[in-house]
Each structure stands twice: as structure tokens, then as C-alpha cells.
């Protein structure tokens, strides 16, 4: 008997799916907002929320664990210094998804994923 998977496969092989999610998460943290299909954004949201939760405690171990997923040092530093301090008091729900409707051409459900609160302006 088949049971429901805990994630969406996105019609890709595991290496392609992982690379897609990694690139989308990096773009999300870089621009603090991303637009794509609703299905892809559900998976990006799951990863992004886990990474923000991990980044709330700034330790060497957590930085090394997140650097396995985020290879850009600027984005990694931004996550630890600007994004995660805003969410220290929040126990989850760091992102929101705004549905845009159907895309012209293939009628795919489109959406925008953004952070609930704006990151700190640290200079």
C-alpha cells in the first residue's frame, strides 16, 4: 500500500530537485522575495523556514551546517546577521505566500513567497 510522501518530487530526479531548491532558496534570501509556481514555492518555504530556525542560534556548528546548503558566504552572513535576528521571538511562520492566479500559457498557479518581517539594516 502506497503512503503519501512528505514532499513533492517536482517531476525531477533527486539531484536536479535539490539543485533547484538550493538555487531558489539562495535567491529568496538574496532578494527577500521570490515569484514562481505555487508547488515549487511550497517546497522552498519548507527549506527556508528550517534554515531560518537553524540560523536563530549563531554558533560555529550551525554556520557549518547551513554552509552545506548555502555556498554563498554573503548570503550565509546575511541570514545570520540580518534575517534571523528579526525572528528571534517568533517560533515559526517566517514567510508568507501570496497567490497571484494562473500563468498565461500553461495555467500554472503562480505565487510570491516573501518574508513576514523586513530584515535589519546593518551597515
Swiss-Prot record:
One of its GO terms (biological process) is translation. Pfam families: Ribosomal_L17. GO terms for molecular function: structural constituent of ribosome. SUPFAM superfamilies: Prokaryotic ribosomal protein L17 (SSF64263). GO terms for cellular component: cytosolic large ribosomal subunit. It comes from the Bacteria. Keywords: Ribonucleoprotein, Ribosomal protein. Part of the 50S ribosomal subunit. Contacts protein L32. Belongs to the bacterial ribosomal protein bL17 family. This is Large ribosomal subunit protein bL17. It comes from Borreliella burgdorferi (strain ZS7) (Borrelia burgdorferi).
Amino acid at each position: 500500500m502506497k503512503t503519501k510522501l512528505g514532499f513533492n518530487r517536482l517531476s525531477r530526479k533527486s539531484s536536479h530537485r535539490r539543485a533547484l531548491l538550493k538555487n531558489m532558496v539562495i535567491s529568496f534570501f538574496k532578494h527577500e522575495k521570490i515569484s514562481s509556481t505555487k508547488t515549487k514555492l511550497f517546497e522552498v518555504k519548507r527549506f527556508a523556514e528550517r534554515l531560518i530556525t537553524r540560523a536563530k542560534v549563531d554558533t560555529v556548528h550551525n554556520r557549518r551546517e547551513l554552509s552545506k546548503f548555502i555556498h554563498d558566504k554573503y548570503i550565509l552572513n546575511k541570514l545570520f546577521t540580518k534575517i534571523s535576528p528579526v525572528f528571534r521571538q517568533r517560533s515559526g511562520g517566517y514567510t508568507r505566500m501570496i497567490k497571484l492566479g494562473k500563468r498565461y500559457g500553461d495555467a500554472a498557479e503562480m505565487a510570491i513567497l516573501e518574508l513576514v518581517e523586513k530584515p535589519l539594516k546593518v551597515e
